[in-house]
Swiss-Prot record:
Subcellular compartments: Cytoplasm; Nucleus
InterPro entries linked to this entry: CK1_Ser-Thr_kinase, Kinase-like_dom_sf, Prot_kinase_dom, Protein_kinase_ATP_BS, Ser/Thr_kinase_AS
UniProt feature, compositional bias: Polar residues: 346-358, 380-402
Binding residues for ATP: 15-23, 38
Subunit structure: Monomer. Interacts with per1 and per2. Component of the circadian core oscillator.
Organismal lineage: Eukaryota, Metazoa, Chordata, Craniata, Vertebrata
Record-level GO BP terms: endocytosis; non-motile cilium assembly; positive regulation of canonical Wnt signaling pathway; positive regulation of proteasomal ubiquitin-dependent protein catabolic process; regulation of circadian rhythm; signal transduction; spindle assembly; Wnt signaling pathway
Keyword presence, Hydrolase: no
Name listed for the protein in its UniProt record: Casein kinase I isoform delta-B
PANTHER family per the UniProt record, alphabetical: CASEIN KINASE-RELATED
Region (Autoinhibitory): 317-341
EC number(s) reported in the record: 2.7.11.1
Length: 409
């Protein structure tokens, strides 16, 4: 029996679990377009999908914000139908042998800062900035970074008066412990600074392959989060960023220096990385690391290693020799229109494949490729949701019992 929602969308197979709900592949039967359908049981103890859909609607029109096509109730479920997206940055990171080149990290950083800035401009903070919640588009939007999952988002100021929420302590740890800011670990109410600090850890994760506080063992989940917090606080930023351009340490130091209700200087942070990008002689061609690799399930570890070495070699040779050796700019770099990258949607003349992997249909979709790079999955869902690997909780700094959020562990 064919299942439909909104009398227009055919429900397909389950492709994962996002925040507070399951996600299915769907089809808009009026035009034959594939969509993502998020379902939440109306009888759930703490319904969130309606709230999340309202936040998505407030965000509509922003670059890198998924389009919401329909919201409503169908039988025993709350439903949100949205634009189908490509793989998450976590999936692509795994596909690239868990190491991104500096060029790819900087291309991503520019767009990710802008996504966070846009959400903040709409009076919300995301509170769960992590690679799983940034997805690439499909087709002509294959170079565009999207931000998803507003299940933990919170309004930080009044939309009319811009009155900031008050400073509070003893708050639950909301989000993902691996990328949580120091102040979040300390139980301080989150604000704009925390989203940006989390992004700094994401960027270093892309550089390093893993963060120093990953893989810590503990008898209980509470003790594990305490160990993550202790390790994070005892690791100086300069040590975390050692061996990488100083801009990454500058970024994190800037974020940690912000006061609770400060408005971050997003332009400064973007320009910090743009100046580094230009000094490295990189080109805004939107050729990411994954565009230079062979897609498919039969790629061996040796092939992946060889491709990564060849990619790094190509990157070194593609740099503009005239740009080498230019000293770092002194003081804060000021935003300049000349230094801004072109829109990711602008077609480029290079021959590399700069879109997300091509859509596949029928029997091809059922093949178990190493990182699910087809249109069916991942879609608006984190790879860690699909595999159940998370360092996430809503853990109160003053509670003995630990109420966990939608991410499980």
């Amino acid at each position: 029996m064919e299942l439909r929602v909104g009398n227009r969308y055919r429900l397909g197979r389950k492709i994962g679990s996002g925040s507070f709900g399951d996600i299915y592949l769907g089809t808009d039967i009026s035009v034959g377009e594939e969509v993502a359908i998020k379902l939440e049981c109306v009888k759930t103890k703490h319904p969130q999908l309606h709230i999340e859909s309202k936040i998505y609607k407030m965000m509509q029109g922003g670059v890198g914000i998924p389009t919401i096509k329909w919201c409503g109730a169908e039988g025993d479920y709350n439903v949100m139908v949205m634009e189908l997206l490509g793989p998450s940055l976590e999936d692509l990171f795994n596909f690239c042998s868990r190491k991104f080149s500096l060029k790819t990290v900087l291309l991503l950083a520019d767009q990710m800062i802008s996504r966070i800035e846009y959400i903040h401009s709409k009076n919300f903070i995301h509170r769960d900035v992590k690679p799983d919640n940034f997805l690439m588009g499909l087709g002509k939007k294959g170079n565009l970074v999207y931000i998803i999952d507003f299940g933990l988002a919170k309004k930080y100021r009044d939309a009319r008066t811009h009155q900031h929420i008050p400073y509070r302590e003893n708050k639950n740890l909301t989000g993902t412990a691996r990328y949580a800011s120091i102040n979040t670990h300390l139980g301080i109410e989150q604000s704009r600074r925390d989203d940006l600090e989390s992004l700094g850890y994401v960027l270093m994760y892309f550089n390093l392959g893993s963060l120093p506080w990953q893989g810590l063992k503990a008898a209980t989940k509470r003790q594990k989060y305490e160990r993550i917090s202790e390790k994070k606080m005892s690791t100086p930023i300069e040590v975390l960023c050692k061996g990488y351009p100083s801009e990454f340490a500058t970024y994190l130091n800037f974020c940690r220096s912000l006061r609770f209700d400060d408005k971050p200087d997003y332009s400064y942070l973007r320009q910090l990385f743009r100046n580094l990008f230009h000094r490295q002689g990189f080109s805004y061609d939107y050729v990411f690391d994954w565009n230079m690799l062979k897609f498919g399930a039969n790629r061996t570890a040796e092939e992946a290693d060889r491709e990564r070495r060849e990619r790094d070699e190509r990157m070194r040779h593609s740099r503009n020799p005239a740009a080498r050796g230019i000293p770092a700019a002194s003081g804060r770099p000021r935003p300049t229109q000349d230094g801004a990258p072109p829109t990711p949607l602008t077609p480029t003349s290079h021959t590399a494949n700069t879109s997300s992997p091509r859509p596949v249909t029928g029997m091809e979709r059922e093949r178990k490729v190493s990182m699910r790079l087809h249109r069916g999955a991942p879609v608006n869902v984190s790879s860690s949701d699909l595999t159940g690997r998370q360092d996430t909780s809503r853990m109160s700094t003053s509670q003995n019992s630990i109420p966990f959020d939608h991410h499980g562990k």
